[in-house]
Amino acid sequence: MEALAPGRAPRGRRRAGASGSVLSPLSLAAVLLCALLRAPPAVGHLARLPRSIHLTQDSLKIVGSTHFPVSVYVMLHQKSPHVLCVTQRLRNTELVDPSFQWHGPKGKLVSENTTAQVTSTGSLIFQSFEETMSGVYTCFLEYKPTVEESIKNLQLKYIVYAYREPRFYYQFTARYHAAPCNSIYNISFEKKLLQILSKLVLDLSCEISLIKSECHRVKMQRAGLQNELFFTFSVASIDTEKGSKPCTDHSCEASKRLSKAKNLIERFFIQQVEVLGKRAEPLPEIYYIEGTLQMVWVNRCFPGYGINVLKHPKCPECCVVCSPGSFNPRDGTHCLQCNNSLVYGAKTCM
């Protein structure tokens, strides 16, 4: 015999009694709303943040290599690390009369530049990195190892990429015991459920989107056929300035708001089981099937950006600007091949 958790309704359980107990749409919503209103505040734990790197600390310094171009990742609109015009070996070596000269995608860089500054010691620093500033940067170093020795020349290449954090969202799937698949009650229930979920996360500046809702007849083990609703929806954070209640403090970070929304949704479905388990009346025609709530984490990038672990192993979960020869027209996570693309961050393949 199957062991059931307290208050759990068997998946194949039918309505008790001979009289019909199909609830009206408003009554169906009342059952869900009861669970919502009784739910305690969600436990505040953070969602797993993408393991991307944050290269905006002033103390972080990047050195070059004479063997291969060094990749540098700068978060969009942020300050870059110090890109040094030396190798790791020369960094700890005394240099006599050093001379530094930097060239970027648009030509020679000068110390007076407001967006890309060259310090007196040859370090390159970006103050507010823009997507169009991505590209190859070359430093020409001229120095003497000692006063007596002749001048040596060194050329170091860096590929500087703009990157952004993924705009992830959660996708949920839940199953409900349903009325006959052609019943209007299923449609009414779906609309009311979406309204309740949307209201649940409204104050967190998150939005609920229906992905699909399908009704199927399912053959149960050692039982007959029953109708089930397969309900798939997503929850994503929206820009706080676009929300009904603009928010600017630290708690308004998208990942924190989305984590709280996820907790509220999970608690909402748990409460549905608890409420039904305490009912003295027969089960309604439509009710949540315990244990069927599934959740997956879905990443998405802005157009012109993509995730590529093989190409960017130092920034494996960053949405890195698409390199020339590739593009991303939508919010997918991959830059697609396009031989005609000649710029960084291409959104179309011309």
Swiss-Prot record:
| Membrane-topology descriptor | Peripheral membrane protein
Expression sites (tissue/organ): Expressed in testis (at protein level). Expressed in male germ cells.
Q: Where is the signal peptide?
A: 1-44
| Annotated localization | Cytoplasmic vesicle, Secretory vesicle, Acrosome; Cytoplasmic vesicle, Secretory vesicle, Acrosome membrane; Secreted
Q: Which Pfam families match?
A: EGF_Sp38_C, Sp38
Gene deleted: what happens? Male mice are infertile with abnormal round-headed sperm morphology and no forward sperm motility.
| Chief location category | cytoplasm
Entry comment on modification after translation? N-glycosylated.
Keywords of this entry: Cytoplasmic vesicle, Glycoprotein, Membrane, Secreted, Signal
What GO CC terms are in its UniProt record? acrosomal membrane; acrosomal vesicle; cell body; extracellular region; zona pellucida receptor complex
Chain positions carrying an annotated carbohydrate: 113, 186, 339
Gene Ontology BP terms: acrosome assembly; binding of sperm to zona pellucida
List the InterPro entries: Ig-like_fold, Sp38-bd, ZPBP1/2_C, ZPBP1/2_N
Gene3D superfamilies attached to this UniProt entry: Immunoglobulins
What is stated as this protein's family in its record?
Belongs to the zona pellucida-binding protein Sp38 family.
Q: Which PANTHER family match?
A: ZONA PELLUCIDA BINDING PROTEIN SP38 (PTHR15443), ZONA PELLUCIDA-BINDING PROTEIN 1 (PTHR15443:SF5)
Its biological function? Plays a role in acrosome compaction and sperm morphogenesis. Is implicated in sperm-oocyte interaction during fertilization.
The name of this protein is Zona pellucida-binding protein 1
UniProt gene name: Zpbp
